[in-house]
Amino acid sequence: MIDHSMVRYVKSVYKKGDRIVCYDMHDPYAPITYGTEGTVTGVDDAGIIHVKWDNGRTLGLIYGVDGFAKC
């Protein structure tokens, strides 16, 4: 869990509609593969960046854990 100031930061940087590319996801069950792009659908109060991926999946990114960048 990240602190409230970091959640505010993540919400200020990643806005609904922003495009994201995934470089590394730490999900042992169903990670998003390297280079997959998607669109941010929102950031929740825990700082999870929710993404609708171009491959049809919806899965959140964890700031500071998963590797990703704006396109």
Task: Kindly label every feature range from the protein language model.
Residues 2-11, 15-71:
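Basic/aromatic-rich interaction segments and small domains that mediate binding to polyanionic partners
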